[in-house]
Every structure is written in structure tokens, then in C-alpha cells.
């Protein structure tokens, strides 16, 4: 069943198509800048005036008359007013606004969802190297990735969550050597503990207490499980390969605990090493060579990435024979495409910005049918943590940064998710621990969850069957607070679509805060459980629909919707 807005948009599209073939596809409503001007605004007359060589206001009058003659506008629209150079301000009948309540209650968890489009996509996120605990930056990426997956699911996509990790790089060697020295009884600060000569303030080895934990368990010959595999240490401090495998498995297990605490589950963990063992890296390189997209210079192999928009050509294979880090990335994305993922989104830190052009250049040069601009990227900044008014920089667990687990333990999973999603990904963010645990209206997650719990309390006090509310008479919902609440509910589907298209889960947090604010205003203005049965049931239906949308929006963010607080 079409929603009221969809029905009106379809009517608008039909009239625009009559005026100018092809224009119907651009049918859209906007929210008026001033609420008193109406419920929807339409700028189509101004957009079409120039190509049709007509005066925009005259065209607006023509479009207004055509729309007023359509059955849909006659059914749902109270008035269409023309303003300025050709704006159409559309005012809905009360019944149109009330209809949104029935739509929410009938569709429940699926309100705002689009039909299955029969296409699958992949979102890669977190993808932390197995060299230490997940830090708060990984937490921001985890929250972003999971919410973006949920948003795309509402738009009919089959979504695959993937975690890619580097189990074959220099950092793994550093992890292994750090663990080996700890197992031999050495510690940071000892003469044999290396320091990076180019940056003395930065230790070349890992210094966190977790390295000692790995070494202790290695010496105790313990068994760890990660990625559905088990690995047992042999306790031999000279067995470098055994130490490496045990340390990687240990930290994968620890990272899994962090992800479980965050209620985050991946469909697949993809190992970088498999790209080499399966020959995918070499296949990609040979394809680029055979296509004439490389050249040799100074003993290195270069990709002609400037042919595809990069600012300079890039080294693929160094003089020592090792590939640079973007080469396996190219091979990995070729495999993503070959696995059937027509759309891919990568969530990464802003420090990866420089890799985008070279990876896309490699994919275009590979000539396997991958479209330009593949994959999409969402880049995020790091997170600053403040507690007690002071910045927190060090974690005993990690040795040099605040971990995701620290943040969850200090606050809650819900607070971490909501807070880390409350700003655009590329915006610097300060996480205020004290605010995240405050039980007041200044805490945004508390404010939204409290609105949900408050509604549940009213529904429980009523004690009736909420399923019957979708059939009640809603004509009593006429006050300004009720009207504002219904209009906000009606915006939810379009907000989901816009947030998904823009990879912008922060839009969901803004929407929920506004919906919660409107509910609290309505609750303060109108008593729900009144003696008049018709009024009471209508108000109960409105708050029940509000509860459902609060629940749905919080679910997109991966945040719980408590019934009591």
C-alpha cells in the first residue's frame, strides 16, 4: 500500500511528465523552511521554467490547478498555495497526517523499508590488524559500519558484513618480536627493547600490558580459539613461527570479545594472507602487466595510475621484491567484485585517504568490468576522550591509547554507539564520558531512550491490546503538538533513504532526538489516559506509533530501546 506521501508524489510525477517528458523522475517534496507555510513544499515549477521557456509563477499556477484536479490531492490535501516566484506550499488534511499512524502500526518494524531489490552489497569495516586491542577509533568505525549496514538493509539490499585483517605484514613481525622478548623475561625500558631511531618518542615494539598476557599464556602452553580455529602454544621461546601464530590467534580472540561486547557480528573474516596463498595478488599483478599498465624503473615495478586520475604513478613492487600495501588491496577488491558484490562500501580512517585513487586506478586498469568509483569510501576521524574534564590518552591495557573496551566499561554499549554516530564521520569528535553516563536531558541517548520508556509506561498503565490501536478513530488528534508529532513520523522513510544514500547514520540520531523532543512536548501538553474513550484511544495510537519509530530508529543504530528506565 502506498503511503500518503508516495501517493501524492506519484500524482505530482504524473503531472510533471505531462508538462515535460522525463520530468516525472524528479518529482520531490521538501520540508518548508517555515512550518506555518505548510507541510510540503514543491519547487518543480522553478526547475522546469527555464527549459520550458515559461514564467515560473505562471507554470506554478498551471501545476497547482492540475494537481488540485487529481483524486489523490483531492483526498489528502487541504490547500495548495503559490508563493514567491513559483513555490507550491502544500497543506495536508488532518486525515492525511493521521494516516501515518496506521501505516506505522501496520508495518511495525518494517515501517520505512523498501522492497527487496534482489541485489547484494558488501560493507568492510573495523578491519583492525591483530596486533592489539581495538581502540576508540575502531569503535567509531564499528558503530558507523554496523549502522550503515542496517541503513542499506532498510533500502532492500542484501548486506554482507566483512572484516579484513592483515595477518602477513610488518606489524605482525613487531607483535611477534615483542611477545618473544616478553616471553624471555624482558620488558619495555630494558636495554634490548628497541626504540624507533627516526622517532625516539615512539617505541618500535608494542609496550601494552596485553603483550605480557600473551607471553604468559604462550609459556603456559594455552590454547586459544579464533575464527573457528584453535591454536595451542608450545612454550618454546625460540619458535618464532609458533609465537607468531599464537599471538595473532590470541589477539583475534581478544578483538572478538570487544566486538561481542559491542553486539557486533560479522558474516566473514577475510585474511590478507589468503590473497597470496590463493594466487590472487600475483594474478592481479600479471593482469596489470599484460594490459600494459605498468613499467619498470629503478628496479621497481610501477603502476601507470596517472592514466586513471591519480596525481602520480605508484610503486607496486619495490626493489626488494615485496609488494607495496595497495597491491593486495587491488587484488582484494577484484575478489569482492568477482564474488558478486556490485556495491561495496569501505569504512576507514582518514589516514587512508591517499590509497583511494591508487586502488581505484588499479581496479580500472585490471579491466574486469568494475565500474568507475568502485568501491565507495566512508572516511572517519579519530576520537578524543574526555573524563572528569581532562583528556584521557593512555590505557594500561593498550599502553598507548584508550580501548573500545575501556569506553564500554566506563559507559555502556548503547552510549558508545549513539555518541560515536552523533556527528558526521569526517568531523572531529570528543567523547565526554561523564555526559555519556548522565541521566538527564543533556545526554542524547538517555533522552531518546527515556522517551521510549515513557511511552511504554503509559501503554502499560492503560493495559489494553496495542494491536487494536491501528483501527481506532483518529479524528480527535487535532492539537499542534499532535500535528507536529505526526509530521515527524511521516518524515522517517525519506530520512532512512537519504541517510543510506549519503552513508550518514548521524541523520538518524538527529531525527530521533527531534522525535523524542516532540513526544516529550506532546506528553507535557496533552494527558493521554483521559476519560473520553475516543480521545484516549486516538492519543494512545499516536504514542504507540511514536514508540515504534523510536524503536526502529534505535535498532538502525544498534542501540536498545528499554521499556523501563
Curated annotation (Swiss-Prot):
Keywords: Aminoacyl-tRNA synthetase, ATP-binding, Cytoplasm, Ligase, Nucleotide-binding, Protein biosynthesis. Its main location: cytoplasm. One of its GO terms (molecular function) is ATP binding. Its EC number is 6.1.1.19. Monomer. NCBIfam families: argS. This is Arginine--tRNA ligase. The lineage of its organism: Bacteria, Pseudomonadati, Pseudomonadota, Betaproteobacteria, Burkholderiales.
Amino acid at each position: 500500500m502506498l503511503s500518503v506521501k508516495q501517493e501524492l508524489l506519484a500524482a505530482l510525477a504524473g503531472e510533471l511528465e505531462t508538462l515535460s517528458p522525463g520530468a516525472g523522475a524528479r518529482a520531490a517534496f521538501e520540508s518548508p523552511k517555515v512550518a506555518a507555510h505548510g507541510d510540503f513544499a514543491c519547487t518543480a515549477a522553478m526547475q522546469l521554467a527555464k527549459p520550458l521557456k515559461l514564467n515560473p509563477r505562471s507554470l506554478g499556477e498551471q501545476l497547482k490547478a492540475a494537481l488540485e484536479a487529481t483524486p489523490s490531492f483531492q483526498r489528502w490535501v487541504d490547500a495548495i498555495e503559490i508563493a514567491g516566484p513559483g513555490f507550491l506550499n502544500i497543506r495536508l488534511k488532518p486525515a492525511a497526517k493521521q494516516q501515518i499512524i496506521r501505516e506505522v502500526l501496520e508495518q511495525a518494524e518494517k515501517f520505512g523499508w523498501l522492497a527487496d531489490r534482489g541485489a547484494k552489497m558488501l560493507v568492510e569495516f573495523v578491519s583492525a590488524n591483530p596486533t592489539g586491542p581495538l581502540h576508540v577509533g575502531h569503535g567509531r568505525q564499528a558503530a558507523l559500519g554496523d549502522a550503515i549496514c542496517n541503513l542499506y538493509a532498510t533500502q532492500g539490499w542484501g548486506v554482507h558484513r566483512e572484516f579484513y585483517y592483515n595477518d602477513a605484514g610488518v606489524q605482525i613481525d613487531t607483535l611477534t618480536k615483542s611477545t618473544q622478548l616478553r616471553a624471555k623475561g624482558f620488558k619495555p625500558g630494558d636495554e634490548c627493547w628497541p626504540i624507533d631511531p627516526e622517532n625516539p618518542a615512539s617505541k618500535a615494539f608494542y609496550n601494552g600490558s596485553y603483550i605480557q598476557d600473551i607471553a604468559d599464556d604462550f609459556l603456559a602452553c594455552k590454547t586459544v580459539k579464533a575464527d573457528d580455529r584453535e591454536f595451542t602454544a608450545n612454550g618454546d621461546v625460540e619458535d618464532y613461527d609458533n609465537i607468531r601464530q599464537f599471538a595473532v590467534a590470541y589477539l583475534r580472540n581478544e578483538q572478538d570479545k570487544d566486538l561481542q561486547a559491542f553486539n557486533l557480528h560479522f558474516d566473514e573474516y577475510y585474511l590478507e594472507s589468503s590473497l597470496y596463498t590463493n594466487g590472487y595478488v600475483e594474478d592481479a599483478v600479471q593482469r596489470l602487466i599484460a594490459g600494459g599498465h605498468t613499467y619498470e624503473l629503478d628496479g621497481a615495478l610501477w603502476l601507470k595510475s596517472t592514466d586513471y586520475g591519480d596525481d602520480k604513478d605508484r610503486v607496486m613492487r619495490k626493489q626488494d621484491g615485496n609488494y607495496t600495501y595497495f597491491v593486495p588491496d587491488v587484488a582484494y577488491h577484484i575478489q569482492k567484485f568477482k564474488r558478486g558484490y556490485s556495491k561495496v562500501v569501505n569504512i576507514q580512517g582518514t589516514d587512508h585517504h591517499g590509497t583511494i585513487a591508487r586502488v581505484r586506478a588499479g581496479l580500472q586498469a585490471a579491466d574486469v568490468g568494475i565500474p568507475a568509483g568502485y568501491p565507495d569510501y566512508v572516511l572517519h576521524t579519530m576520537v578524543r576522550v574526555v573524563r572528569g574534564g581532562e583528556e584521557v590518552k593512555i590505557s594500561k591495557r593498550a599502553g598507548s591509547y584508550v580501548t573500545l573496551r575501556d569506553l564500554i566499561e566506563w559507559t555502556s554499549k548503547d552510549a558508545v554507539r549513539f555518541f560515536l554516530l552523533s556527528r558526521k564521520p569526517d568531523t572531529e569528535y570528543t567523547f565526554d564520558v561523564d555526559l555519556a553516563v548522565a541521566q538527564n536531558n543533556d545526554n542524547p541517548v538517555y533522552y531518546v531512550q527515556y522517551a521510549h520508556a515513557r511511552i511504554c509506561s503509559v501503554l502499560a498503565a492503560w493495559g489494553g491490546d496495542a494491536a487494536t490501536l491501528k483501527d481506532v478513530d483518529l479524528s480527535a488528534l487535532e492539537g499542534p503538538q499532535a500535528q507536529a508529532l505526526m509530521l515527524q513520523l511521516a518524515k522517517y522513510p525519506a530520512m532512512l533513504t537519504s541517510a543510506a544514500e549519503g552513508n550518514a547514520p548521524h541523520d538518524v540520531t538527529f531525527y530521533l532526538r527531534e522525535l523524542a523532543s516532540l513526544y516529550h512536548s506532546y506528553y507535557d501538553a496533552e494527558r493521554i489516559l483521559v476519560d473520553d474513550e475516543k480521545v484516549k484511544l486516538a492519543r494512545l495510537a499516536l504514542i504507540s506509533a511514536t514508540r515504534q519509530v523510536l524503536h526502529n530508529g534505535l535498532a538502525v543504530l544498534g542501540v536498545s530501546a528499554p521499556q523501563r528506565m
